[in-house]
Regions:
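Short amphipathic alpha-helical segments, especially helix-boundary/capping motifs
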Residues: 16, 80-84
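Sec-dependent N-terminal signal peptides
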Residues: 4-15
């Protein structure tokens, strides 16, 4: 059986206090930049922007972030303002678990004052998030059995 592995790192916005976690991506700031500004900026940077109707988000493919190559980077909006930036990787092998562990350790080191909280912790699905009061950084993966 083929395995589908998804690793996803998402940055999302919750309005509260001062942000410590990175909140700017591709020249766009969470909670500030409008949808039009994000799309215009991505076009200027030479990205081909696609829209996913099912998930109601825009995305670009084949990007590098945090020293890793990602299949996609998605952008979600709330009230026409950038609210989430997510990085995803699809793979048919479990090397993604190593990438997840590496990214999790990097975030724990970089944001040591923010406690990570596991919301899912089993062999096929892990999700940990860090919340500084404004920005939520979540790191996770999901392994699905395929045909």
């Amino acid at each position: 059986m083929k395995r589908l592995v998804l690793l996803f790192i998402a940055f999302s916005l919750f309005l509260c206090a001062n942000a410590q976690i990175r909140s700017s991506f591709y020249g766009c700031k969470l909670g500030v930049t409008t949808k039009k500004q994000v799309l215009d900026n991505l076009k200027q940077l030479g990205h081909k922007i696609q829209y996913d109707k099912e998930n109601n988000c825009y995305y670009i493919e084949n990007v590098t972030f945090a020293g890793e190559r990602w299949n996609l980077c998605q952008f979600e909006f709330y009230k026409d303002t950038l609210a989430l930036v997510g990085f995803g990787l699809l793979s048919d092998n479990e090397d993604v678990v190593d990438l997840y562990n590496r990214n999790l350790e990097n975030v724990k080191t970089k944001y040591s004052e923010i406690e990570g909280k596991m919301t899912s912790d089993n062999q096929n699905r892990k999700l940990c998030y860090f919340d500084d009061g404004i920005v939520v950084l979540s790191i996770g993966y999901k392994i699905e059995e395929g045909n």
